[in-house]
Amino acid sequence: MSHKEISDRIIKYLMINYPFVADIGLMNGRMGGVLFFYYYAKCIGEDYFFDYADMLFESVFTSLRQDTPIDFANGLCGIGWAVEYILQNGLSEGEPDEVLEDIDKKVMERDVRRISDMSFDTGLEGILLYVITRLESFDRAGLPKPFNRSYIEELYAKAYENKDSLSPHLQLIKRLADIQAERPDFARKPNISDIISLSESVTVPENLRSLPIGIKNGLTEIALKLIGKAQNSL
């Protein structure tokens, strides 16, 4: 079976099953499907897949609740990061500060000084990536910033205190320091390699149901890698 046949088989499976996924997060839930189908639609230029991604995106935002966690894997930070990825990479159009205003406020409600979990999926590292990606998205000279100075200072202090626990390839400490110094890298766009390793080999199971549907060790991760290799554009 060719890579295209394998990809088509996975894509059909994702389209059928994503609307029924209860989790709305990026790494394990529907937002992973949103990101994938916007990316795939852009690759092949088919409006049908844009429409599908729009539908899935709306279902994610209408499912947000007051108790939706803020973590990256299953919560607001991952959803918000995916929105920035989609908009900054030209996969859809919109104003990120309008779309993400409520998410930013919920993220700032969490006292970062009390965070003991340093992990990417559920802890400080995922929050850092989201906040930094937001502040690097475009030059807001003369405009309100999504996060206030005191929050950024507290976040940097916590990150620096735990710098040995953070993934070096994301350069989170340096990027946040540059933001504090009013010199964020606006040219840096969110990349899929920020959240998954693209160097790992891809193994497609015969039974697609044997893997979770999402990005984290799942079928959507495989689909992203297969399409990315074909397009050489992740």
Predicted regions and their residues:
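Terminal, non-catalytic domain-edge segments
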Residues: M1-I6, Y130-L234
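Internal amphipathic alpha-helical repeat/solenoid segments
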Residues: H3-F72
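Small-side-chain structural scaffolding
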Residues: S7, I11, M31-V34, A53, ...
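Alpha-helical scaffold segments in carbohydrate-active enzymes
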Residues: Y13, Y39, S59, G78, ...
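Solvent-exposed loop and edge beta-strand segments that line ligand/cofactor-binding
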Residues: L14-R30, T62-G75, D111-L124, A157-A177, ...
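Specific register positions within alpha-helical solenoid repeats of the TPR/Sel1-like families, i.e.
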Residues: L35-Y38, K42, W81-E84, Q88, ...
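Extended ligand-binding groove/face enriched in aromatic
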Residues: D51-P146
